[in-house]
Amino acid sequence: MSKADEKYLDIIENILENGYYDNNRTGIETYKLPHQIMQFDLSKEFPILTTKFVAFKTSVKELLWIYKDQSNDVRKLQNENVTIWDEWMLEDGTIGKAYGYQVAKFKQIDNLIDTLKTDPQSRRMLISLWNIADLKDMSLTPCCYETLWDVQNGKLNCMLVQRSGDMPLGVPFNMCQYAVLVHLIAQVTGLKPGLFTHVINNAHIYKNQIEGMKIQLKRRDKAYEAPKLWINPNIKNFYDFTADDIKLIDYKHHDKIKMEVAV
């Protein structure tokens, strides 16, 4: 069994058994738990679920849209056949001053890469998408809103802080795509990928997702080993990466589990 399946399904079981039943802004009740944490050693294994299909290529395209293209334009994703942001698209075709807009506004990727190269022991390396002044102009405030970076013995560590985690749908995307981000940043800074820690402040399962999660839990004993991540070794500039430069090798998985996203 992959570490991703093991740690993820442990949280799912905990929420279903011990979660607090609550209302929220969507109108669909949730079972939730605070402060859930998963940690993966990226030098040993790539974290993606095998107990259900995760649309890895779509998650990579979204990641590059945010951090490489530094875009808030949903139409760019649609041109890549990615529709996951359609529900939050505003009349101008964007999601407002959210996600990639904040990366570009403060040149956050450039600053991170420069610091990793010139002052890798800095304790001030972080990317924040939570700009209080612009929250009112975002169609959706960022769920994965902060990453903190650290270097130890030539390995790049990253902590992802997620304020709100839709465990069945959002979190499987986020855990693998931010692991990819660590690999990409490590490659262009001459480092090796190290620890990836995923902190979820509010980990929840919507009431209409419970049956789907029970199906996935039944697959625990039939989980597969983790696939290998391949990144084009010739890419040395972060902005040269494309989705075709990032692939999974031997990704074995169970079938997709259809569940609805709460808007």
Curated annotation (Swiss-Prot):
It catalyses: dUMP + (6R)-5,10-methylene-5,6,7,8-tetrahydrofolate = 7,8-dihydrofolate + dTMP. (6R)-5,10-methylene-5,6,7,8-tetrahydrofolate binds at residues 166, 262. NCBIfam families: PRK01827.1-1 (NF002495), thym_sym (TIGR03284). Pfam families: Thymidylat_synt. It comes from the Bacteria. Belongs to the thymidylate synthase family. Bacterial-type ThyA subfamily. The active site is at residue 143. The keyword Transferase applies. GO terms for molecular function: thymidylate synthase activity. Homodimer. This is Thymidylate synthase. Keywords: Cytoplasm, Methyltransferase, Nucleotide biosynthesis, Transferase. GO terms for cellular component: cytosol. The lineage of its organism: Bacteria, Bacillati, Bacillota, Clostridia, Eubacteriales. Catalyzes the reductive methylation of 2'-deoxyuridine-5'-monophosphate (dUMP) to 2'-deoxythymidine-5'-monophosphate (dTMP) while utilizing 5,10-methylenetetrahydrofolate (mTHF) as the methyl donor and reductant in the reaction, yielding dihydrofolate (DHF) as a by-product. This enzymatic reaction provides an intracellular de novo source of dTMP, an essential precursor for DNA biosynthesis. GO terms for biological process: dTMP biosynthetic process; dTTP biosynthetic process; methylation. Its EC number is 2.1.1.45. It comes from Clostridium acetobutylicum (strain ATCC 824 / DSM 792 / JCM 1419 / IAM 19013 / LMG 5710 / NBRC 13948 / NRRL B-527 / VKM B-1787 / 2291 / W). The keyword Transferase applies. DUMP binds at residues 25, 123-124, 163-166, 174, 204-206.
